Amino acid sequence: MDEKNKKASDDIQRRRFMLTINNPEKYEMSHEKIIEAIHSAFAKQGILYFCMCDEIGESGTYHTHIFIMITKKKRWSAVQNAFPHAHIETEVRGTAQEVVAYIKKEGKKNAEKKETNLPNTFYEEGEIPTFYISNKRAEMLE
């Protein structure tokens, strides 16, 4: 089922979200506006960490990847309301470090796409947690 067409019964709650906004300038979503929207939408849940970076994909689409970690769960629909033009992944796989490496296109796994990232567009707030947050528990990383 398409993420944008979920039913209310599928309105799951998560602590980690990965968003992609295609053509953010079309929706006037500068980094400043995105930061403002994150602070506004997630303040009550306690923002642990977030980062973003711009990229031009292989098909030529300019887009912004955003990764957000919060202390309390938030409903998918609330995130969709805050970012109506974003594709939202609720099943974020990997540790925070792995997701940040993906966004930055760093490491062996992401090296082939390094040139798609736009220089000087990476932004982050908070410290990358040294624990893994799943939807059921937090585990210390070794």
Can you annotate each of these PLM segments?
Residues 56-61, 88, 92:
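Beta->alpha loop/short-helix hinge microenvironment recognizer with preference
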Residues 60-62, 76-77:
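Short catalytic/ligand-binding loop motif for oxyanion handling, primarily in non-cytosolic enzymes
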Residues 44-59:
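Short, glycine- and small/hydrophobic-rich beta-strand elements in well-ordered beta-sheets
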Residues 1-43, 71-142:
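Catalytic "initiation/cleavage/transfer" segments centered on a nucleophilic residue
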Residues 62-70:
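A generic structural motif
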Residues 21, 52, 61-63:
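Intrinsically disordered, low-complexity peptide-like regions
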